A protein has these predicted regions:
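Active-site proximal beta-strand in glycosyltransferases
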Residues: 73-75, 90-111
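Membrane-proximal helix-turn-helix segments that form the acceptor-binding/catalytic region
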Residues: 114-134
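A conserved mid-protein helix/loop that constitutes part of the nucleotide-sugar donor-binding site
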Residues: 15-19, 192-206
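Conserved donor-binding/catalytic core segment of Leloir-type glycosyltransferases
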Residues: 172-195, 214-216, 334-335
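Nucleotide-activated donor-binding/catalytic signature segment of Leloir-type glycosyltransferases, i.e.
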Residues: 229-248
């Protein structure tokens, strides 16, 4: 049987891609879907459970040609095609192409150093304007999508689940006993320079004599960058005030870690770390975001309490760690941790684009 939907999952993301594969196979018609995954470990684990998971080590235009019979809906989870490859897609393929946007897809810097590069990127954007649909897990990306690709392409909202939902989180929280009274400050969620760790360290230096711990999540990203920021933080605050996470954690371990966090700082303007922020918001942590960023505007629009990164270093430590509102609105985060809501979003998407 030829599947109705082929999913191209180039990013080795055992959490978000893996959970979506599980969600679709267990709540929808599995025979309608084929999943091409780029991660070998994820393939080995998932293929033991599901027959529709295929390992694909190379993702490029020829990969689409390899699997496309002319009938399937081609769903790209994070854009792996280059601007040149997008320009080479035939109209009949564009009309069956669905792009599920990941944060870096929209906001990574593109090379426009020459007129030729600019024209190529412009043509690629026009091509995307003709595809079957764009899917945004973060609904506030829609403005950027419309700005770049026009108003004609249909845009739908479907959220990538983490595999843990409201009831699961609540259960972990109920059974977790915090024993460390120090103020725990989480800076970023990975080892990427856009998180501006060094800038944040300089702002936090004012509080280095306070009873605090800085948590650095460095399990993925740029290894050289990770080494550098650990060195910088060690010099500035001392190793005894650092909690550095180099290894991947289970979601149970990660949520327990978040239970210990008091303050989370994410200083960037584009969309990223959305799943992390949803969990932190639901758990009632004090979140600092860039006041010029899309994440800050989104949470403010949803009436969820967030604070400006510009205040860090200007206010007292007591002000830094104390929330203005004790009973904050967690409805936004709660809706995105609702399993039935997420299933409904994806079911509706497949019914609409199929």
């Amino acid at each position: 049987m030829v599947p109705a939907f082929i999913h191209f999952m180039a990013v080795d993301s055992p959490i978000f891609n893996g959970v979506l594969i599980q969600l679709i196979n267990e709540t929808m018609k599995a025979e309608e879907h084929m999943f091409l995954v780029g991660g070998k470990d994820a393939y080995i684990r998932l293929s033991k459970q599901y027959k529709n998971v295929v390992y694909e080590p190379n993702f490029q235009l020829s990969t689409i040609q390899k699997y496309d019979t002319g009938r399937e809906i081609l769903i790209v989870h994070s854009m792996f095609l280059t601007s040149t490859e997008l320009c080479c897609l035939e109209t009949k393929q564009l009309k069956r192409l669905v792009w599920c946007v990941w944060g870096h897809d929209l906001y990574q810097k593109r090379e426009n150093r020459t007129l030729k590069m600019w024209v190529r990127n412009w043509r690629a954007d026009r091509k995307i304007g003709d595809i079957r649909a764009i899917v945004a897990g973060f609904k506030y990306d829609i403005n950027e999508i419309r700005h770049r690709f026009g108003k004609s392409v249909p845009v739908y909202n479907a959220f990538y689940a983490s595999g843990y939902y409201k009831d699961d989180v609540d259960c972990i929280v109920r059974n977790y006993q915090r024993t460390d009274a120090r103020t725990h400050i989480m800076v970023g969620h990975s080892a990427y320079s856009f998180l501006q760790h060094e800038k944040i360290f300089r702002q936090l230096e004012k509080y280095k004599n306070e009873d605090m711990v800085i948590t650095l999540m460095l399990s993925y990203g740029d290894k050289e960058y990770a080494t550098k920021i650990v060195e910088d933080a060690s010099k500035m605050f001392g190793v005894e005030k650092l909690n550095v996470i180099h290894n991947f954690m289970t979601w149970h371990e990660y949520i327990q870690l978040l239970c210990n966090i008091d303050i989370a700082i994410f200083d960037f303007d584009h969309q990223a770390a959305f799943g992390n922020l949803i969990l932190l918001s639901y758990l009632g942590k004090k979140i600092y975001l860039s006041p010029t960023g899309v994440m800050y505007r989104a949470f403010k629009t949803e009436n969820s309490e967030v604070y400006s990164c510009l205040d860090i270093g200007r206010i007292t430590f007591e002000e830094l760690r104390t929330k203005k509102q004790l009973n904050t609105n967690t409805n936004y985060a709660e809706s995105l941790l609702n399993k039935e809501n997420i299933i409904t979003q994806w079911k509706n998407l497949f019914q609409t684009i199929g």
